C-alpha cells in the first residue's frame, strides 16, 4: 500500500503509529491538524465516498476542504474543486460537465439538486485502502475559460507526484520547511503545490486565510507562496517585508512578477524572489532554482523531466538566442491527460510529435533561462509589421513613479493592424511622458499609441489581469 508511488507520503499510517507525527501538519482557518488527525478523519471520509466516481468540493480555505480532498485521494475518488466565488452559470457548467455525483463537505446555497455528504473533523477510521493506480485521475481542475466555457483538466496522481517532486528538488524543499500561503484551494498554486506539496514532502503548512502582508509576516515560515499582487502588497509594507528576511524562499507565480516588485523585495528582505511558470494543464514546468541565479523577469530553467522548445509561425524550431520570440511548447511527466469530454480541444493542444502547446510565447536565453512574453492571444502584439511583447513595455512603465499598475494590449487599428495601448492605474499620470519613456528605453515602434488611465484593472481570483476585458 505505501510504496514509493503513494501520493501523500507523509500520511503513512504505519509511520504515524510509530510516532512520526507532528501536531501542526496543516494549520487552516485557525485550526491545526496533526498527521494523525488528517489521516483518521480523511479515512472516515473515504469510507463514506469510496463507491463514488467524482465528487464536487466547494474549495473554501477550511478544514472541511482539506479532509474532503485527502479523503477522496485515499479512496481513489476524483475531486472536482469548485471556486467558492463561482457564479451560478459557471458552477452549473462545472457540475454538468464533470458529472459530479454529490457535494462533499461545504456546499453553496443552490446545490443543483445534488446530495451533500458531510465531512466530520472529529470522526476517525483506520481502515486500510490500497493505493489507487498512479495513472488514475485525481482531479478535474477547471480552467479560467478565457476562450469559452471552462475546460476540465484531467490530472493524474502520477503527474501530480512528478510535479511536486521536481519542485522539491529545484527548491530544496524538505520536511524541515514550514510553508506559508493564503492562496485559493481550487487552482494548481494553492491546492496542488500549497496543500498536496506539503503532505507529500512532509513539511507543515500554514494557510493564512487571506494572503495579507501582516499575516505573512506573523506566520514565521521558511517557504512562502504568493501571486504578484500579494508580493506587490508585501513590498509596499516595509515592516512586513522585513519580517520575511528569515525565510528561505519567497516563491512567486501564476502571473509575471513586475521587475520593480522583484527589486523592492530583494532590497527589503535581503533575498531575491524565486519565480516559476506553469498552468493547470502542465503543473509547474519552469522555475528558478534555490541554489541558482534569480534573474528578474525570468522564470528560470526546466524542472527535472521537462523539455521545452520555441516554435515560430512557420513551424520551425527557434534558437535559444535571447531574441527569438516563439510559441512555448513543453513535454514531461506532469503534463495532463486531456480535457474532459473535449477530445477536439485535447487534440488541438498537442502537436503531432507529442508536445503540449502552452498558448504562451517566450524567449529562451543561450544559458537556458526562459522569459515569458505572455499569452499569444493577448500579449504578443503585431503592430506595423513588428512583433512586440507587452511585458517589456509594462516593465518600463512600472518603473515610472506615477504608475502603480499597468496592462498593455494590442487593439485593432486600420493602419497598424494593432496599436499598442497601455491601461494605467496611477496618480498624476501624464500620457506623453509615459509614451516618450517607452520610446527612449525600448524603441520607437514599441511606444504606446495611447495611454488610458483607469481606476483598476480586471483580475481573476489568482490576481491575473484579464486583458480580454480591456478595450
Residue spans of the language-model regions?
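N-lobe entry segment of adenylate-forming
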Residues: 1-48, 53, 431, 436
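Conserved pre-ATP/AMP-binding loop-to-beta segment of ANL
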Residues: 5-9, 22, 124-142, 149, ...
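Conserved AMP-binding/adenylate-forming
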Residues: 31, 46-86
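Conserved AMP-binding A3 loop
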Residues: 32-36, 138-165
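AMP-binding/adenylate-forming catalytic core of the ANL superfamily
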Residues: 57, 103, 332, 337-338, ...
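Conserved AMP-binding/adenylation subdomain of ANL enzymes
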Residues: 161-178, 186-222, 237-238
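Gly/Ser/Thr-rich phosphate-binding loop
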Residues: 221-226, 235-295, 307
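Conserved beta-loop-beta connector loops within the AMP-binding
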Residues: 309-329, 348, 366-367, 428-431, ...
Amino acid at each position: 500500500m505505501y510504496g514509493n508511488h503513494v501520493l501523500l507520503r507523509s500520511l503513512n499510517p504505519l509511520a504515524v503509529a510509530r510516532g512520526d507525527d507532528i501536531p501542526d501538519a496543516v494549520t487552516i482557518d485557525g485550526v491545526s491538524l496533526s498527521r494523525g488527525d488528517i489521516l483518521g478523519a480523511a479515512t472516515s471520509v473515504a469510507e463514506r465516498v469510496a463507491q463514488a466516481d467524482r465528487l464536487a468540493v466547494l474549495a473554501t480555505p477550511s478544514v472541511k476542504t482539506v479532509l474532503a480532498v485527502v479523503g477522496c485521494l485515499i479512496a481513489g475518488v476524483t475531486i472536482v474543486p469548485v471556486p467558492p466565488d463561482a457564479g451560478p452559470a459557471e458552477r452549473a457548467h462545472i457540475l454538468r460537465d464533470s458529472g459530479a455525483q454529490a457535494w462533499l463537505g461545504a456546499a453553496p446555497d443552490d446545490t443543483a439538486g445534488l446530495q451533500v455528504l458531510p465531512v466530520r473533523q472529529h470522526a476517525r477510521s483506520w481502515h486500510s485502502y490500497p493505493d489507487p493506480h498512479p495513472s488514475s485521475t485525481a482531479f478535474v481542475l477547471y480552467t479560467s475559460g478565457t476562450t469559452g466555457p471552462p475546460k476540465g483538466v484531467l490530472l493524474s496522481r502520477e503527474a501530480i507526484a512528478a510535479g511536486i517532486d521536481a519542485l522539491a528538488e529545484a527548491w530544496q524543499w524538505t520536511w524541515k520547511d514550514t510553508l506559508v500561503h493564503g492562496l485559493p484551494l481550487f487552482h494548481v498554486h494553492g491546492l496542488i503545490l500549497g496543500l498536496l506539496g506539503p503532505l507529500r514532502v512532509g513539511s507543515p503548512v500554514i494557510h493564512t486565510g487571506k494572503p495579507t502582508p501582516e499575516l505573512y509576516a506573523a506566520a514565521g515560515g521558511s517557504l512562502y507562496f504568493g501571486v504578484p499582487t500579494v508580493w506587490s502588497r508585501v513590498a509596499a509594507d516595509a515592516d512586513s517585508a522585513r519580517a520575511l528576511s528569515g525565510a528561505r524562499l519567497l516563491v512567486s507565480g501564476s502571473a509575471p512578477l513586475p521587475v520593480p516588485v522583484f527589486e523592492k523585495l530583494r532590497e527589503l528582505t535581503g533575498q531575491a524572489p524565486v519565480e516559476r511558470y506553469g498552468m493547470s494543464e502542465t503543473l509547474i514546468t519552469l522555475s528558478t532554482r534555490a541554489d541558482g541565479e534569480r534573474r528578474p523577469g525570468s522564470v528560470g530553467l526546466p524542472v527535472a523531466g521537462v523539455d521545452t522548445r520555441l516554435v515560430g509561425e512557420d513551424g520551425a524550431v527557434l534558437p535559444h538566442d535571447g531574441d527569438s520570440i516563439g510559441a512555448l511548447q513543453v513535454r514531461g511527466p506532469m503534463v495532463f491527460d486531456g480535457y474532459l469530454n473535449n477530445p477536439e480541444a485535447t487534440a488541438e493542444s498537442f502537436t503531432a510529435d507529442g508536445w503540449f502547446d502552452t498558448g504562451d510565447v517566450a524567449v529562451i536565453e543561450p544559458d537556458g533561462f526562459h522569459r515569458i512574453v505572455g499569452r499569444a492571444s493577448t500579449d504578443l502584439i503585431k503592430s506595423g509589421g513588428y512583433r512586440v511583447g507587452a511585458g517589456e513595455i509594462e516593465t518600463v512603465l512600472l518603473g515610472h513613479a506615477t504608475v502603480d499598475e499597468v496592462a498593455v494590449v494590442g487593439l485593432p487599428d486600420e493602419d497598424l493592424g494593432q496599436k499598442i495601448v497601455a491601461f494605467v492605474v496611477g496618480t498624476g499620470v501624464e500620457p506623453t511622458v509615459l509614451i516618450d519613456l517607452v520610446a527612449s528605453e525600448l524603441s520607437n515602434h514599441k511606444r504606446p499609441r495611447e495611454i488610458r488611465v483607469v481606476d483598476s484593472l480586471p483580475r481573476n481570483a489568482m490576481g491575473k489581469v484579464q486583458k480580454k476585458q480591456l478595450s
